[in-house]
Amino acid sequence: MASGKEIKTQISSIGNTQKITSAMEMVAASKMKKAQERMEASRPYADTIRKVIGHVARGNLEYRHPFMEERQVKRVGYIIVSTDRGLCGGLNGNEFKKVVKHANEWKEQDVEADFAAIGSKGTSFFKRFGKLKAQVSGMGDKPELKEITGSIQVMLDAFEEGKIDRLYVVFNKFVNTMTQEPTIHQLLPLPQAGSEEDVQTGSWDYLYEPNPESILDTLIRRFVEMQVYQGVVDNFASEQAARMIAMKAATDNAEDIIDQLQLRYNKARQAAITQEISEIVSGAEAV
């Protein structure tokens, strides 16, 4: 049985760790709130671009953009959004499992896959597959669109050149503090028109300069970039929520361990006192 001094040292060590996990929990909660605000702020922009794409496409039915063309799928591409740091529970692991399962389903149809990774965890994981075409990491707490456009462009070029026939973005969708869902969203090919709701929102009659085709090309590229960026912001909010929960669990577990160690310390102290009393009594009887 450990001595009282050793147990006291353990209690002190775990107490220090508990202070760290508690601080990390509070920091994650603060970052999550800010990430939610960025997430909500970016959505209207992407939604508006989607509606404009639908209207421009419907106004030029004779032109079909290559990014809207369905074709036989021989190879697929994934842009995988992950975290740069750990200590966020099974957030990355669950996402990677979903990607691997999805890619294996395509492989059963003789369709291979290429990957682009956003985040160091995704980079290190998918490097093992040997098909990592682009990667970016180290974006910090305020990811910006310009930091990910290079990796996105690599996959857009691959689609345009016919090297891949379908493109997905994968991220952890922030549902609420307790729930983050690994999500696979198809980026390309895009549907030609918007939703029925968009169709019924009124008639748009615009003149396009220089021409609808170049505007549509720019809009679609920007839309894809915004969809991926939305995934990055969603994933960051999910990361902070998962880390907050993980750190809270660690803090609670540390409290439980401290309670158990305190009980052991009290028992050890009681045993030592009893031993001392026994020795005093034995000594008195000997006299």
UniProtKB/Swiss-Prot annotation:
Assigned GO CC terms: plasma membrane; proton-transporting ATP synthase complex
- The principal location of this protein is membrane
Q: Does the keyword Chaperone apply?
A: no
Q: Which InterPro entries match?
A: ATP_synth_F1_ATPase_gsu, ATP_synth_F1_gsu, ATP_synth_F1_gsu_CS
For this UniProt entry, the molecular function terms from Gene Ontology, in alphabetical order, are: ATP binding; proton-transporting ATP synthase activity, rotational mechanism
Keyword set includes Zinc: no
Q: Where in the cell is it found?
A: Cell inner membrane
Could you tell me which Pfam families the record lists for this protein? ATP-synt
The record gives the membrane topology as: Peripheral membrane protein
One of the GO biological process terms: proton motive force-driven plasma membrane ATP synthesis
Query: What UniProt keywords apply to this chain's record, in alphabetical order?
Result: ATP synthesis, Cell inner membrane, Cell membrane, CF(1), Hydrogen ion transport, Ion transport, Membrane, Transport
Q: Which top-level group of life is the source organism from?
A: Bacteria
Q: How does it assemble?
A: F-type ATPases have 2 components, CF(1) - the catalytic core - and CF(0) - the membrane proton channel. CF(1) has five subunits: alpha(3), beta(3), gamma(1), delta(1), epsilon(1). CF(0) has three main subunits: a, b and c.
Role played: Produces ATP from ADP in the presence of a proton gradient across the membrane. The gamma chain is believed to be important in regulating ATPase activity and the flow of protons through the CF(0) complex.
Give the family, as the similarity comment puts it.
Belongs to the ATPase gamma chain family.
What's the protein here called?
ATP synthase gamma chain
> Where does this protein come from, organism-wise?
Idiomarina loihiensis (strain ATCC BAA-735 / DSM 15497 / L2-TR)
